[in-house]
Amino acid sequence: MQSSRFVSLSQAVFLLALSTASGGALGQQPGSDFQPRVGQHGKDVIWVPTPQSLVDKMLEVAKVTPQDFVVDLGSGDGRTVISAARLGATALGIEYNPDMVELSRRNAAAAGVSGKATFTKADIFATDFPNAIAVTTFVLPGNAPAAFAGDPASPTVITLFLLPGLNLKLRPTILNMKPGTRVVSNSFDMGDWQADQTVRASTDCTGYCRAFLWIVPAQVEGTWQLGESQLSLQQRYQYFTGKLATGNVVAPIADGKLEAERVTFTAGGTRYTGQVKGGTMEGTSTSGGTEAKWQAARR
């Protein structure tokens, strides 16, 4: 497989972020002459760089902006993190190989983005990635915490190039992340979790040129009270089915879909659109050209 990073057979997702002040210099060895070799072995993997055109396409489909906190899993020579930082995002690379971490820091410094792009040496399997904190905190060896100035922010974008089995292992945890988190995987899918979008690099790419985007959906599985009716839902990733029962009248749910916290479905000829807000859903229903407000609460 090809990547701009090491793709570990035993990796999962990521560590707490480094501060922007220390991220470009912590542990750096300016005189190091290490250069990665295509095909070199890492932790259960080999390393091959991803074409920059695909890196750019992945960040484009994720709609990365300066408001994002991007975390790259197995960040290799740092090109994805550096590219995200060039877009103004705060970006963190997690990499197991310490030589690659130092190389990434040098590359970030050369690109002039050390204030936005940080890197740490870590096994992402041993981290609590949903609680990662951008800019404010990171974990030192021995679990000694260190804090820095900055505002906390959970990851909004995850980029990865892992083997299919690892994607499946990460999937349950990713699905429990904040709704709206964008996940972009180079080349490999998430099994039966259907991608929301698929893109290809158009130039400078001769292999492994496809990427998948998923948007983490809100969780709506269960029973909800919708006025005098009971809404029972069964969720499968960003899609759901179920029924809306009003007394003895039961209407099946059709076209149930979630995009982050946006929910849409049809029941009994009425189209419902709205937003999931924790234990409530609310929005507008349309039936026969007539609109009405609706609200449901989790039971």
Name these PLM-found stretches.
Residues 218-293, 298-299:
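Central antiparallel beta-sheet cores of small beta-barrel/beta-sandwich binding domains
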Residues 20-22:
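N-terminal signal peptide c-region/cleavage motif recognized by signal peptidases
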